[in-house]
């Protein structure tokens, strides 16, 4: 049994690029990112401090990716890193998609009451427009409505920039976990083979 701090230099099947294994880890990594996004979207409804939440989601994604890589016995470091980046992109986009689905579902449930209110008070009907029915226009609508960050509301380009920062923080946290695992599993990266 390997002791902590010892480095494995040769893992059966590890280190070589294999197309089948790459497709498995990349596809599975995207699924892991999507599943993590669903859990993050559920948690985000109750707790989502800015800057902290994307780091927590990224750490969870990193742990999930390590477990996925261990499950499929992936050994090619570059493939593992690319799969983690793909999973981080799925996490970031997935959180917005699952929020979109939740808002769409809530809007459909409230549609009869909203229609009655619109008929009774037509002058107020334009103050809170309904969200678009497709994902791309929904993101633009959401950016236009703004994202509250403390006492500041980021709208338009600033909302998009804050979402991009969330994605980068999640990716960095996931890569930190996966990178530490790779280093522990494959040894010091300075011994000739980098990521």
Region spans (language model):
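Core subunits and conserved enzymes of cellular information-processing
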Residues: 61, 73-195
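Hydrophobic alpha-helical segments, chiefly the membrane-spanning helices
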Residues: 8-104, 108, 182-187
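Short, charged cytosolic
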Residues: 1-7
């Amino acid at each position: 049994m390997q002791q902590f701090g010892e480095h494995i230099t040769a893992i059966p099947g590890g280190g070589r690029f294999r197309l089948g294994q790459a497709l498995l880890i990349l596809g599975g990594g995207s699924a892991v990112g999507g599943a993590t996004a669903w859990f993050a979207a559920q948690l985000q409804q109750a707790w989502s401090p800015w800057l902290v939440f994307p780091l927590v989601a990224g750490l969870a994604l990193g742990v999930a990716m390590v477990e996925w890589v261990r499950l499929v016995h992936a050994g090619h470091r570059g493939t593992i890193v690319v799969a983690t980046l793909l999973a981080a992109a799925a996490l970031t986009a997935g959180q917005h998609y699952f929020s979109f689905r939740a808002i769409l579902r809530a809007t459909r449930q409230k549609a009869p009451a909203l229609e009655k209110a619109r008929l009774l008070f037509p002058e107020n009907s334009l103050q809170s427009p309904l969200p678009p029915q497709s994902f791309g226009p929904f993101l633009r609508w959401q950016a236009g409505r703004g994202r509250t960050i403390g006492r500041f509301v980021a709208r338009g380009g600033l909302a998009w920039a804050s979402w991009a920062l969330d994605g980068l923080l999640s990716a960095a946290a996931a890569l930190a976990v996966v990178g530490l695992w790779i280093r522990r599993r494959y040894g010091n990266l300075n011994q000739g083979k980098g990521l």
